[in-house]
Amino acid sequence: VSDLAAALDVLGARWALLIVEQLLEGPQRYGDLQRELGAGTNMLATRLRELEAAGVLYRLPLHHNTRAYALTERGLALRDAIDALSRWGVDHT
């Protein structure tokens, strides 16, 4: 499997990169992610579980039994790739 194929196994699913892009702004709670992205509840929950299992994000305990999602170092390392894809979108779509 090529390196690109391995990356797409983790990030190629619908909403995955958009979740990472949103979390590059800082930790966010589930409801905030859902509101910002407009993703369906089941889809968002599935993608968050997949990205957590892949080590891209983690659940951050907050006060009063609430949690937020935050990027790991592995997730933060995607900043340049996401910026490049965003620039490509501006230039070519």
Residue map of PLM features:
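HhH-family (HhH-GPD) DNA N-glycosylase catalytic core used in base-excision repair
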Residues: 5-6, 86-93
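N-terminal helix-turn-helix DNA-binding core of bacterial DNA-binding proteins
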Residues: 2-43
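Glycine-centered, phosphate/nucleic-acid-interacting loop/turn motifs that mediate DNA/RNA or nucleotide
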Residues: 55
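Basic, amphipathic "hinge/linker" alpha-helix immediately C-terminal to the N-terminal HTH DNA-binding motif
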Residues: 12, 63-85
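Residues within the DNA-recognition helix of helix-turn-helix
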Residues: 47
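Short beta-strand "wing" residues that participate in macromolecule-binding interfaces
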Residues: 59
